[in-house]
Amino acid sequence: MSPKKKILLVEDDNALSSVYESRLDLEGFDVATVANGEDALSKAVEFKPDLIVLDAMMPKINGFDVLDILRNTPETTNVRVIMLTALSQPTDKERAKALGADDYLVKSQVVISDVVERIRHHLGIDQ
């Protein structure tokens, strides 16, 4: 049996974070959660996730800046990143893609099963 894929969930809404963490755990992932951009950066290096689910609007350091730093840090430059945010403007999606996001999902337009499906897709896991 292969080791569990590691997911770092970066979300400042505790209720949403708890729901996503529970579902991802049930799906068989090893999940770590943090609630702000500063903690995301240190946890990404320490935890060595296979994929990061990253909110955009967070305290301390926003998700776009976190993404930029991740892409310019040798230990995290190749980690898959899915931005999961309330920001729905095309310019926000373009900014995320330009900074190196692998995917961009708008919270109001997806349900948790959609997010799990995208995670599996980016990790090359069959349903």
Regions found by a protein language model. Give the residues of each.
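Two-component/phosphorelay signaling modules centered on CheY-like receiver
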Residues: 14-32
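Short amphipathic alpha-helix used as the core "switch/output" element in two-component signaling
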Residues: 42, 64-77
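Receiver (REC) domain active-site loop signature in two-component systems and cognate sites
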Residues: 58
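Conserved acidic carboxylate
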Residues: 11
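Active-site residues of response regulator receiver
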Residues: 55, 85
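Active-site beta3 strand of CheY-like receiver
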Residues: 47-53
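Helix N-cap/capping motif at the beta->alpha junctions
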Residues: 33-42, 63
